[in-house]
Every structure is written in C-alpha cells, then in structure tokens.
Amino acid sequence: MSQRSTKMGDTIAAIATASGAAGIGIIRLSGSLIKTIATGLGMTTLRPRYAHYTRFLDVQDEVIDDGLALWFPAPHSFTGEDVLELQGHGSPLLLRQLLTRCLDLGARQAHPGEFSERAFLNGKLDLIQAEAIADMIGAADLRAARAARRSLDGVFSRRCEALAQQLIRLRIHVEATIDFAEESLDTLDRAQIRTSLQTLNVELTQLLRDAEHGKRLCDGLYTVLVGPPNVGKSSLLNALIGSDRAIVTDVPGTTRDTLRESVHFHGLEFVLVDTAGLREEGDAIEREGMRRTLNELQRADLALVVLDACDPQIGSLALADALTSVPRVLWIHNKLDLLTEPPSALDTDVIPVSAMTGAGLETLKTRLRTLLLGETVETIEGEFSARLRHVQALQRTAAHVTDANAQFAYEHLELTAEELRLAYKALGEINGSMSPDELLGRIFSNFCIGK
C-alpha cells in the first residue's frame, strides 16, 4: 500500500467545488467518523441517499451556513466508505469555516485525488476509470470528454481484461505441455498455441492503435512547425490560432525560442509549437534555438515542415535526419500569394497555403483533423480516453507477446511461458492490478483535492 494510503482508517474532508465565489459550494467527507461529524454539525438523523435540509453549526451552536446534507453509507458510495456531502452557499469564507469545523470534529484534510484513490483501493474503480475522472474534468472539447466518459464506463478496462484472460489461458496451455517435455508437441497442440498467439497479437495491436488514438484525443496532437528561417512559420502559427502570438519580421532567425499554443479545429485540440528556423550556420543564440527545435521534434506527434513556395528547399541536413523519427510529417508550401503562376501538381502530403491571405488554411485544418482522428477507431462510439503510460504499457505487452511467438517457434516452452507472464504483468499495470505503489502515488497526486 502506498505511503499516501497508510491511513485508510482516517476520515478525510475537502472542498469539492472550484475555488472562488459561486452559487453552491460542496464539502465532501469519507471515512468512519461520518456520523460523529454529522452529529457535531447539528444533524441528528440521516437517511441514506436522501437530501436533508439542515443548518451547519459551529462549536458554540452558531450557524455557519445552511444547506443540504447527503449521506451515502458504505459500501454503496463512491469511495466504498461512509460518505457525507455538505452542500451550502458557495462563499469561500463559509466553506473554509465549515471545513475547519469538520477537521475539528476529527477529519483531516484530504490529499489531492485521495477520494478517487480510496475508490480504487476499495475496488469501486480500476485505475483506468480513476484516471478517466481526471481526464473528463480536464477535457478541452466535447469529443475528448465523451471518450473519457467511455473509459469511466469501462470500455477500455473491458478490452484490457479480455486480453488478460487470453494471456492466462494461453500461459496455462503452454505450461501444461511443459509437464510432458519428453514428448514433442503434437501437430494439434502446436497449431492451437500458434493460432492463439497470432490472435492475441492482432487484438493487442488493434488495442494499442486505439489507445494511441485515445491519447491524441485527450492530449491533443503535439504539432511542431519546423523549416528553414524566414519561410513564415510564425506567420502560419498566428494565422492558425487567429492571434499575433509570435513575432514576425523579415529578418531570418527572429524566432530564437519555442512558443506553444493550444488551438481547436473542428472541436479537436492541437498543441502548435513554433520553433527556430534550421540552417547550417548561425550565431551562438541561434544555434541554441536550433538545438531546442530538434529537441521538440523528438516529442512531436506531427511535424509541419514549412517551406517557401517560391523555393521549397529544406536547407538543413539536421532537419532531414530528425524528421525520420517523427511519426507523421506534413509538408507546407507557404507564401502561395507570392507565386506568379499557380503551383504545379503537388504530392498529397504537400499543402500550399498563404499565411498572409488565408488561402489553403481550411484545407490544412481539415488535414490536421484527419491526422488526429486517423482510421484506427471505426466509430466515435468506440473511442476511449488513454494516457501515455497506457500506450507504453501496451507497447511492452506487445513486445513480450512478440518474443513469446519467437520462443515458441523454437519450442522453447519455458521461455514462451515466461514471456507470457511478463506480458500479463505489463498489461496489469494499466488497470492497476500490477502497478507499483509509487506509480499510484504519482497518478493520484495530480488529481483535484476534492476528487
């Protein structure tokens, strides 16, 4: 159990609504002292799952506030413990006073995410669902919110569990044959195991693609604008976000540092990164800017390579090399307005635009939307939210399944079984069944205090 959770017997309390004045404010409590605290606040009777109008009293029986109290007895609550919600006026002063009174009556201030952590530890949620709560709260658009809702409803969890069961059955089959190691595998057994490994690999590959898609929905597509100096990268960024955020001049090398802006196209989030132009020479400051550009490319989901439509030369060997590791590359020929003749037929991965006039920008936005959504999830109904750690765990799982396939080809049954065990362990990190305590601590510490 994590260090954060060694006091599971404590009763915790926190303000669950956003800071600032509002019409309603909520304090949430969870733990074994709920009835004692309710009595201390002046509530003599509470019926489960009923809204009780009451006055919340201080130690001198003075009224702190009035509002509604709702009691959810264990185990039928969000955390699996006794839960009490106090709904009063959204005055920060009154909420702090009411929270202090709850703490004086025996509760302690909850850590960030501790309510969700208790729900996880008490088996009310798996780790995917707990993270989906935070993803739903932080969603930047409706589609991402709906994807997080599906993860909270268990769409992602059920697919992981189905794969976990396949791994268990397959490992049992392989280990059963080890008991008869003196006999070679018969044709039927060999075919069954090989088919099961192939089926597992196909389904795992599809789940990995869908998880990558879910991560893009939640995080947005990290899109880095790169290219030679003075081709209009900053102008293009300004045109796409509809604001003069980046400095634009005719002097090559004006952009020395990276600039990040979140923007939504067709209801989907993109993180656009303007970078220093890349060329073979430059002063010390410009070279530092170019180094940062190459670093940004290492984390890019997509590179927009911006070139001058009048002279579309990349002009940098370092950029050409760096692009080989970027998952997606889209070529932009900017300054279309300066061409004296219409552009000749271009490759489908090249989009002619003019940051100055806006020509081609809608085509670019549509292409960006297509790149974010991809074709990995057949319907919107199948989308779910995912995080980087989920994708990485699935990648490790897939690598172990691939190794199991290779070991089985040589009839190394013990090694095949071991790779399947490691695959199951990696997959279990996703829903928390195999997650180390320090990972759980990091995940829940990033939640809101009242969640």
Swiss-Prot record:
This protein's record includes keyword Membrane: no
Binding-site residues for (6S)-5-formyl-5,6,7,8-tetrahydrofolate, renumbered to this chain: 28, 85, 124, 451
One annotated GO biological process: tRNA wobble uridine modification
Cofactor: K(+)
Enzyme class: hydrolase
Cofactor notes: Binds 1 potassium ion per subunit.
Residues at which GTP binds: 230-235, 249-255, 274-277
EC number of the protein: 3.6.-.-
CC terms in the record's Gene Ontology section: cytosol
Span of domain TrmE-type G: 220-373
Residues where Mg(2+) binds: 234, 255
Disulfide feature: none
Protein location: Cytoplasm
Primary site of residence: cytoplasm
Keyword Chaperone on entry: no
Positions annotated to bind K(+): 230, 249, 251, 254
Stored InterPro entries: G_TrmE, GTP-bd, GTP-bd_TrmE_N, GTPase_MnmE, MnmE_dom2, MnmE_helical, P-loop_NTPase, Small_GTP-bd
Molecular function terms, GO-annotated: GTP binding; GTPase activity; metal ion binding
Alphabetical keyword list: Cytoplasm, GTP-binding, Hydrolase, Magnesium, Metal-binding, Nucleotide-binding, Potassium, tRNA processing
Subunit structure as annotated in this protein's UniProt entry: Homodimer. Heterotetramer of two MnmE and two MnmG subunits.
Protein purpose: Exhibits a very high intrinsic GTPase hydrolysis rate. Involved in the addition of a carboxymethylaminomethyl (cmnm) group at the wobble position (U34) of certain tRNAs, forming tRNA-cmnm(5)s(2)U34.
Family: Belongs to the TRAFAC class TrmE-Era-EngA-EngB-Septin-like GTPase superfamily. TrmE GTPase family.
Protein name, per record: tRNA modification GTPase MnmE
